[in-house]
UniProtKB/Swiss-Prot annotation:
Belongs to the thiamine-phosphate synthase family. 4-amino-2-methyl-5-(diphosphooxymethyl)pyrimidine binds at residues 40-44, 72, 111, 140. The keyword Protein transport does not apply. This is Thiamine-phosphate synthase.
Amino acid sequence: MNRSSNSAFAPTEKKLGLYPVVDSIEWVERLLKIGVTTIQLRIKDKQPKDVEQDIITAIKLGRKYNARLFINDYWQLAIKHHAYGVHLGQEDLDIADLDAIKQSGLCLGISTHNDTELQRAKRLLPSYIALGHIFPTTTKDMPSKPQGLRALKHQVEQTHDFPTVAIGGISLEKVSDVVATGVGGVALVSAITKASDWQQVTLKLLELVEGKPSC
């Protein structure tokens, strides 16, 4: 692993709130327009040169709407174009230059799927830690089993020094139970992007997660 020096990454909000994870500029823009303030652009399996313009545009949108825009995986481009933050999976930690990310002043989020990965993430002192997957999910092939609400609550209690984000199979119907665990952020993918009325669902999620009125 490309170890980082023994100091914390840039801080972010303790409660990141509703945290959609989307794969296009179109989704970034439409969600920021209706009040989302934390969002991740997750484009997978493309060469950096093929995603650079989208990353530039996403970062500009983040600034326009004063939002926390995280770039998944493409940490070099995130540094180059001064993103708010980067999100890395466990496999990315082995190859990313964590010191370069830290020295650039970017926030860092790390995915975890069990207690071993959680302890590893905590040692790196990231800006936030993602805990998952909570429920079965079809968005991403997962080698691990769903952790469930009880495990999530335990992990949140063990991670009180860090902002936490729950992810994985979280639907509109389940989000209140997730929030009740004390987790500070709720990441969703298909609950928004596959909704028949994405705008209504997003506004309702903002109400349930952040207390923002939906009308």
